[in-house]
A protein has these predicted regions:
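Short strand-loop junctions, especially beta-strand C-caps/beta-turns
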Residues: 43-45, 87-91
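Ser/Thr-rich, low-complexity intrinsically disordered terminal regions
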Residues: 3-27, 31-44
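Long, contiguous binding/interaction regions
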Residues: 107-112
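Long, charge-dense
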Residues: 114-117
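Short, highly charged C-terminal tails/helix-capping segments
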Residues: 119-126
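A short acidic/glycine-rich loop-to-helix N-cap element
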Residues: 90-106
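Short, aliphatic-rich beta-strand segments
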Residues: 82-86
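Short, internal acidic amphipathic alpha-helical interface segments
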Residues: 39-81
Length: 126
């Protein structure tokens, strides 16, 4: 799905359907209006059970120390949903296909980390 964010940035959104063992993954790639970067996001990677907020903060801090290229966090005021984030910077002289390739490689890295970290987080925080 191609669209624009509330701020007017171009965005590509992908949703991978879950099965009995995995929830849906919402991948988002937001291209900055100035063309210098893209924000890669996996939305709602983990849902935190009621009363597990402190456990979630500790677990996310551990994930942030272990997985240096991806940030695990709560988006905005939502403290029940864990989001994964990565930013990709582009050089002014880069061709568009190279920028797209960096985004794909970044998402691939994020999905690999997601596959490793999220099952453990879901078990711990549900």
């Amino acid at each position: 799905l191609l669209g624009k964010t509330h701020g007017g940035d171009e965005a590509v959104s992908l949703v991978f359907g879950g099965d009995e063992d995995a929830a849906e993954l919402h991948l988002l790639c937001i291209f900055a209006q100035n063309g210098g970067s893209a924000a890669l996001r996996i939305l709602r990677a983990v849902q935190v059970a009621e009363g597990r907020h402190l456990d979630a903060l500790i677990a996310l801090q551990d994930c942030n120390a272990r997985y240096r290229f991806v940030k695990f966090c709560f988006p905005g005021e939502d403290e029940r949903s864990v989001q994964m984030e990565m930013d990709v910077l582009f050089l002014p002289e880069m061709r568009p296909d190279l920028c797209a390739d960096l985004c794909v490689k970044g998402m691939h890295l994020m999905l690999g980390i997601c596959a490793e970290a999220v099952p453990e987080l879901r078990q711990l925080l549900s």
